[in-house]
Amino acid sequence: DFSAPAKTKTGWQEAEEIAKKFHIQDINFVKPGIGETTRVLLRRMPWKILVRDKKDTEYIGHILKLAEEKSVAVEEYPLQTYRACGLIRDLHADV
């Protein structure tokens, strides 16, 4: 049936799924997109960086370099809407 719209995941849905998978209580600690991920690495307390493909250096090369400089883990994750997603460390969470 081609009359039904294709079911695609929205960016918001993907961010919510990431928050749930990584037990992040505040959705504001999930920063999807190349720009937001870069900002997390430059101005925030990053916990982990998720990338669709570590070999995608044309788009995320600077993210990989910043993560290495700051000793932040980079994990390949099956992102569908974004190439990268920064996860911010919750300084108030019980670890």
Predicted feature locations:
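Generic structural signal for short, solvent-exposed loop/turn connectors between secondary structure elements
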Residues: F22-N28, R52, E75-A84
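Extracellular/luminal Protease-associated
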Residues: N28, P32, L41-I60, L64
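Short basic, glycine-rich beta-strand/loop surfaces that mediate nucleic-acid
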Residues: G61-V95
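Acidic-enriched, low-complexity/disordered segments with a strong bias for Aspartate over Glutamate
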Residues: D1, D26, D53-D56, D90, ...
